[in-house]
Amino acid sequence: MKKIILVAGGTGGHFFPAVALGEELIKRGYEVHFIIDLRCKKYISQDMKVIFHILDLKRSGNIFLFLPRLSIAVLKAIRLLYNIKPSVIVGFGGYPVISSMFAAVFLRVPIIIHEQNSYLGKVNKFFTSFAKKIAISYKNIKNLPEFAKNKIVVTGGIVRKNIRNLGSVAGPRNDKLFTIFIFGGSQGAKLFSELIPASIQILIQKKPQLKLHIIQQAALDDQVKIKDIYLKLNITYELAEFFDNIALQYKDADLVISRAGASTIEELTYIGLPAIFIPLPSAADNHQYYNAKWLEDTKAGWCLEQNNISAGKLADKILDLISNTKILEDASHNLLKRRKEGHKLLSNLIEEVI
C-alpha cells in the first residue's frame, strides 16, 4: 500500500481541509499519515482514520533561537519520513510545515504544495522551486514566482464532508425571519462581541419592524452583555463559544458575518452562502484581505476592513442586503459558480505525481 504524508499546522483552517483530503485518499486505498503541531492536537477526533504524528516547531523572532529549534525539528522529520517512506508529501503552508518539507527535500520525496488563499504564503513560496505541483484555489493568485507558473493546477479549496453534505443552501429560508450567523473562525474574534450588538441596535432603530435571529460565536465572558442587548431588542439569539458542527448553523443562516480565512471562504463558496467579511488585519501577508477582496470584486461577497469599520457602516450594509434580497441571490449564484470538488481534484493530482 502506498503511503502519503499530509502536513498542516496552526489553525483549523489548515487542519480541516487536510483531513478532508486524507479521507478521500483513504477511500482510494492509500495509507495516510498526518504531521501536525501541538496546536492542532485539540482538533483530533476518534472518527478520523488518518495516522497522526506531532512534530512541533515553536516560532521565535530571534534567529539564533529559531535555527537550533529548526535543525532539531528537521532531524526528527527526516527520521519520521525515512521510517514511513511516503510516495509523496503534501504541504498546506504555514511555518509548522517547514521542518517536514526540508526533510522531504533532503530525502527526495516528491512535494506538492496546496495554497488555499488568494495570496501565496511565504513558506509555500519558499518551497515552490522544490515542488512538483502547486495546487491553488484562486486562478489569479498573487505572489507566485514567474518560474512556478507552469506548476500550478487550480483544484479549488477543500471542504469538510459535513459541509459538502449540505449541498447548496442558497435562497431565503424564512420570509418573516432573517437569520445572521456571526463567527470568527478557529481563531475567534473578540471585536465581533462589541461591533455586532452595536450594529444590530442601530439596525433595529432604522427598521423597528425587522424580525432577526442572531447566531453568534462569543467568548463566555462576553455572552451576558450580548444577551442583555438582544433581549432588550426583542431579538431571538443563539450564543456559543464554539460551534462543534458548524454545518447546522450554515443551514439556518441567510447571511454570514465572519473573518476571511481560506477555509471559511471555501465552505461558504461550496454551499452558496453569502457573507460580509471583516478580514483579520494581523493575518500573515494580509492574506484575508486579498481573499475577501477577490470575492467582492467578483460580486460574491462584501469586504469591510477592520480599520475603517464602524457599527453604523455595518448596520447600513446589513440593511441594504436585507432590503435588496436580489443582491444576496446574485452573490449566492456567483459563489456557486466558483465551487469545485477540491478534495477529488487534489487527490487526482497526487495520483498523477505518484
Curated annotation (Swiss-Prot):
Keyword Cell cycle attached: yes
Enzyme Commission number(s) from the entry: 2.4.1.227
Cross-referenced CDD domains: GT28_MurG (cd03785)
Binding site for UDP-N-acetyl-alpha-D-glucosamine: T11, G12, G13, N117, R160, S186, Q288
This protein's GO CC annotations: plasma membrane
GO BP annotations, alphabetical order: carbohydrate metabolic process; cell division; cell wall organization; lipid glycosylation; peptidoglycan biosynthetic process; regulation of cell shape
GO molecular function: UDP-N-acetyl-D-glucosamine:N-acetylmuramoyl-L-alanyl-D-glutamyl-meso-2,6-diaminopimelyl-D-alanyl-D-alanine-diphosphoundecaprenol 4-beta-N-acetylglucosaminlytransferase activity; undecaprenyldiphospho-muramoylpentapeptide beta-N-acetylglucosaminyltransferase activity
Location within or outside the cell: Cell inner membrane
Alphabetic keyword roster: Cell cycle, Cell division, Cell inner membrane, Cell membrane, Cell shape, Cell wall biogenesis/degradation, Glycosyltransferase, Membrane, Peptidoglycan synthesis, Transferase
Domain of life: Bacteria
Bilayer topology: Peripheral membrane protein
Catalytic activity: di-trans,octa-cis-undecaprenyl diphospho-N-acetyl-alpha-D-muramoyl-L-alanyl-D-glutamyl-meso-2,6-diaminopimeloyl-D-alanyl-D-alanine + UDP-N-acetyl-alpha-D-glucosamine = di-trans,octa-cis-undecaprenyl diphospho-[N-acetyl-alpha-D-glucosaminyl-(1->4)]-N-acetyl-alpha-D-muramoyl-L-alanyl-D-glutamyl-meso-2,6-diaminopimeloyl-D-alanyl-D-alanine + UDP + H(+)
Pathway noted in the entry: Cell wall biogenesis; peptidoglycan biosynthesis
Family matches, as NCBIfam families: murG
Function as written in the Swiss-Prot or TrEMBL entry: Cell wall formation. Catalyzes the transfer of a GlcNAc subunit on undecaprenyl-pyrophosphoryl-MurNAc-pentapeptide (lipid intermediate I) to form undecaprenyl-pyrophosphoryl-MurNAc-(pentapeptide)GlcNAc (lipid intermediate II).
Family, similarity comment: Belongs to the glycosyltransferase 28 family. MurG subfamily.
Protein name, per record: UDP-N-acetylglucosamine--N-acetylmuramyl-(pentapeptide) pyrophosphoryl-undecaprenol N-acetylglucosamine transferase
Gene name of the encoded protein: murG
